[in-house]
């Protein structure tokens, strides 16, 4: 009898359904968050909210199905609470990106303080991407591509790093939290406008938890070829006065780390495979091994010169910020030494390290056109 009553009780629990369900049309889904510093006293929070009701009403149109909520306050949590008074409950489980205005982290407020609330909040995805922009974040969020919200456009643009070397890999909130905990210098992709369109154009260096300097897309390319994961892209060069394009298929790198007489030495070898995708030389003969070898040597020489110059002259001597991951190699191979020097790594050790960069290039293919004879 007791077993029968217990079974009936369990059945009633199963029939009760989902007690905490929410009607999706009544929800406000935050897909993008922006932070600005409009004055010396306050921060400004911009939330791009995807409203299902607007999607239903504007189905088939090219209108942006989002709303912007803008709130001022002294802390991020305070602004979040104030924003909650203006709207129906918002949910950040679908947050795609966090956009920081340079003004927020270029002064005295450390980036660890700015993202502290997001890291602590269980409702914020640590996989959300983080970007920096020069102007107001609301100006970025106000842009849309034929009805596609800016947050989605920017998120999709991160896929371009597979086809261009000038765009760095996206950086997540969780990865930034790890960098800040370790006091590392690191890069964050930069978002801006180009010809009226949203674009990921370059990156920003974060050093000592503050914005330190912007990098151009070409400088990002140099870092990618030195230490990044290069999945594809095109390198334009000249040979005998004629342009040609080398398309990267795959790439890998190997690093050897040594320490002697108070100085670190790194031997970085970059192996690249690709194809001769375009050649403006009217006398080219891609069927000749000697011609292909000369193309390989030209690419090797150019990549070696540009990357070495940027790393040794600008990154080590001028910027003095290790955004290449070499410090992590020291941490792995010389853990006890790293504990003693980690806080002085950028200025005292990385800037004086000896770096030997080597490049091996292979042309695996030259397309469907060979010599036209």
Swiss-Prot record:
Family statement: Belongs to the GerABKC lipoprotein family.
Q: Where is the protein found, in the record's own terms? A: Cell membrane
Q: What is the lineage of its organism?
A: Bacteria, Bacillati, Bacillota, Bacilli, Bacillales
- Superkingdom of origin organism: Bacteria
* NCBIfam families per the UniProt record, alphabetical: spore_ger_x_C (TIGR02887)
Q: Does the keyword Membrane apply?
A: yes
This protein is called Spore germination protein A3
Biological process (GO) annotations held by this record are: spore germination
Q: Which Gene3D superfamilies match?
A: Nutrient germinant receptor protein C, domain 1 (6.20.190.10), Nutrient germinant receptor protein C, domain 3 (3.30.300.210)
Annotated InterPro entries: Spore_GerAC-like, Spore_GerAC-like_C, Spore_GerAC_C_sf
Q: What does this protein do?
A: Forms a complex at the inner spore membrane which acts as a receptor for L-alanine, thus is involved in the stimulation of germination in response to alanine. Can stimulate germination in the absence of GerD and GerK gene products (fructose and glucose receptors, respectively), but the response is improved in their presence.
Q: State the UniProt keywords alphabetically.
A: Cell membrane, Germination, Lipoprotein, Membrane, Palmitate, Signal
User: Do you know which PANTHER family this protein is assigned to?
Assistant: SPORE GERMINATION PROTEIN B3
Q: Where is the lipid attached (N-palmitoyl cysteine)?
A: 18
